[in-house]
Amino acid sequence: MAPSHLSVREMREDEKPLVLEMLKAGVKDTENRVALHALTRPPALLLLAAASSGLRFVLASFALALLLPVFLAVAAMKLGLRARWGSLPPPGGLGGPWVAVRGSGDVCGVLALAPGSSAGDGARVTRLSVSRWHRRRGVGRRLLAFAESRARAWAGGMGEPRARLVVPVAVAAWGVAGMLEGCGYQAEGSWGCMGYTLVREFSKEL
């Protein structure tokens, strides 16, 4: 499917369940890889080993003492990712959420935006997900182009001296990172845990 066969419009109320499932599926595709990346860093391994050693004095089962800290850490990380990216955001100053729709009416992607935390920060993508059945068909690029146009219009309406768009990407989402770099975005920051990156932020001056 070529990008020209796509349109982007605001999400309708009856599309909420479908869009929510799409967001959850998108998070599920990356959460295991993010958890594996985070929990195999040396500081995380040291903390897990210390927790397991402590639990051995409390629990009768060596296997349970070994696995329980890992299970709890993975569960906490997955819940955090789902809360951040796997739910519908509240309506923001930039409108939306928006959906990408095929000519047949099938919803194949979702996008949400929010203003930056301070003046000059530009706009931020808070949700960007494409149905697994429609990936590598230009849907992500079409949504990104729409996000850029909204960010420009919002910056002009707010009297901002420049338009800028920031897109956070989970460290394991190599496909999204490659798409952004191909569209002129540059990695400018990151955040994570214990000094290790879990999410990179890409930005572009529009």
From Swiss-Prot:
Keywords: Activator, Acyltransferase, DNA-binding, Membrane, Transcription, Transcription regulation, Transferase, Transmembrane, Transmembrane helix. One of its GO terms (cellular component) is membrane. It comes from the Eukaryota. Coiled coil: none annotated. Gene3D superfamilies: 3.40.630.30. The chain crosses the membrane at residues 57-77. Residues 55-206 form the N-acetyltransferase domain. InterPro entries: Acyl_CoA_acyltransferase, GNAT_dom, NAT_camello-type. Its EC number is 2.3.1.-. It is found in: Membrane. GO terms for molecular function: DNA binding; N-acetyltransferase activity. Pfam families: Acetyltransf_1 (PF00583). Belongs to the camello family. This is Probable N-acetyltransferase 14. It comes from Bos taurus (Bovine).
